[in-house]
Regions:
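Cyclophilin-like peptidyl-prolyl cis-trans isomerases
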Residues: 1-154
Length: 154
């Protein structure tokens, strides 16, 4: 782990997933995600939309894809490609509608490049992401048991 302040640890129902946050790509998104993690926002949140060969989406407090923290983010599109293990912000049609929902790519998804804000990548536990139950919506979904910043984990 290179930078504990920018390393997020997700304990999921399928196992641990470690995400390296990239503040140089999306400083506003990284700051928001860190604040939500430290507030316990993601604890118990389900993976509500999981499409085989594409991505696993989480971060909706309702478990439906319709909710968020209530604080929209300005887009920080960047040149980082959407490849296996990329962590990117979900949004509605408006580019500046990202909030708390994010997704992890199972595979390359270049059609998302420059249209969604990449803010991190999975560095450990991608095999656990691969085990997340698929569905849209997911029946009896897997969840984030707890989310912590490595700097705060004892």
């Amino acid at each position: 782990m290179t930078d504990p302040e920018n390393t997020m640890i997700l304990e999921t129902s399928k196992g641990r997933v470690v995400i390296e946050m990239r503040p140089e790509l999306a400083p506003g998104h990284v700051a928001r995600i860190k604040a939500l993690v430290r507030d316990g926002f993601y604890d118990g949140i389900v993976f509500h939309r999981v499409i085989d060969g594409f991505m696993a989406q989480t971060g909706c407090p309702h478990g439906t894809g319709t909710g968020g923290s209530g604080q929209k983010l300005k887009a920080e599109f960047n040149r980082e490609p959407h490849v296996r293990g990329t962590v990117s912000m979900a949004r509605a049609q408006n580019p500046d509608s990202g909030d708390s929902q994010f997704f992890i790519c199972f595979d390359d998804a270049g059609f998302l490049d420059n249209q969604y804000t990449v803010w991190g990548r999975v560095t450990e536990g991608m095999e656990n992401v691969d085990k997340i139950k698929r569905g849209e919506p997911v029946q009896n979904p897997d969840k984030i048991v707890s989310a912590k910043m490595a700097a705060d984990a004892a």
